[in-house]
Design a protein with these regions (language model features):
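Extended, non-globular alpha-helical segments
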Residues: 47-85, 146-148, 153-162
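Flexible beta-alpha connector loops of hexameric P-loop NTPases
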Residues: 142-150, 175-185, 236
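Residue-level signature of catalytic and energy-coupling elements of molecular machines
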Residues: 4, 69, 93, 125-127, ...
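C-terminal lobe/tail of nucleotide-utilizing enzymes
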Residues: 2-66, 183, 243-276
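Phosphate-binding loop that captures ATP/GTP phosphates
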Residues: 112-173
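Conserved, well-folded catalytic cores of nucleic-acid-processing
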Residues: 7-14, 65, 72-80, 116, ...
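Conserved catalytic-core segment of NTP-binding enzymes
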Residues: 135, 167, 181-276
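Walker A/P-loop phosphate-binding motif and the immediately C-terminal alpha-helix
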Residues: 65-128, 133-135
């Protein structure tokens, strides 16, 4: 399976609008939680078979690669910012085209952040077309973003699923919807993005979205986030599609970076194997 050769590469250095400063008032009302629902147990063995990072395994090469990524994201995620800017702890993971490793990256990055002592992480499946993250974790059939945006459930807490990995919660995509693109473009999506990002002072929100060139959902969602990671598959992603995808993003509202996927895996693995 895929691995990461290096961490974030700055795509542009245009100033971003920044994050919303989280105040005590914003944190005074805890996010409603489904207290009666037990934490969902993730099938760690199956995830490892798919090449995913898990907290119970010795995966030193993969762990170190994601440490490089998360350090750069965390360094910006909780900085003070002017009022009205997008929350910088709200991070969108996308790509130019399908099958370049965005869901792999989103999940592994969330696991890496969950290993931190000082932060929690909310992993959100906002790819309402493929819902790959929802299937990966085994949350099919649970209400998710679709049901909340369509008004079928009443609050964010009813779609947040706790997992048995400490500090990791998930919002699934929900069921398929014929107007999923319009749901992502709705004001309800803007409110949802702001709420999950500003509710807790120590939370990183990682959002797996559709590829930028496959439909308009990803570019629409990008208007709400503070950081965007564009996953690029080594030796596969062509320059022109990547340029076209980047052109859909506004660096004035979000920090944009590239992450090179599926490259130099053997060299990094060999380094850690030799140290065993």
């Amino acid at each position: 399976m895929s691995s990461i050769e290096r961490a974030m590469e700055r795509m542009r250095r245009a100033p971003a609008a920044g994050a919303v400063d989280v105040t005590a008032a914003q944190m005074s009302e805890p996010e409603p939680a489904p207290a009666s629902d037990p934490a969902v147990a993730l099938d760690l063995a199956a995830l490892r078979e798919l090449g995913m990072l898990t907290p119970d395994a010795d995966q030193r090469a993969l762990q170190e690669q994601y440490r490089l990524v998360k350090r750069q994201l965390l360094a910006r995620a909780f900085r003070p910012a002017p009022d009205g800017g997008n929350p910088v702890n709200l991070i969108q993971i996308t790509s130019a085209l399908a099958s370049e490793g965005k869901t792999f990256t989103a999940f592994n990055l969330a696991i890496s952040v969950a290993m931190e002592v000082d932060f929690t992480v909310l992993l959100v499946d906002a790819d309402l077309t493929r819902r790959g993250l929802t299937h990966l974790i085994g949350l099919q059939g649970r209400p998710g973003i679709t049901e909340l945006l369509a008004g079928e459930v009443g609050d964010v807490g009813s779609i947040v699923t706790r997992t048995d990995i400490p500090r990791l919660s998930v919002i699934p995509a929900g069921q398929g919807h014929p107007r999923s693109t319009e749901l992502v473009a709705s004001d309800a999506m803007r409110r949802l993005s702001r709420e999950v990002a500003t509710r807790y002072h120590d939370r990183l929100v990682i959002v797996d979205s559709t590829p930028l060139l496959m439909d308009s959902q990803a570019a629409t969602l990008a208007a709400h986030v503070g950081q965007i990671v564009v996953v690029v598959e080594a030796s596969r992603t062509a320059e022109m599609p990547l340029r076209n995808a980047i052109a859909l993003l506004d660096p004035a509202t979000a920090d944009v970076g590239l992450l090179l996927n599926k490259s130099m895996a053997r060299r990094r693995s060999s380094y850690y194997d030799d140290a065993s």
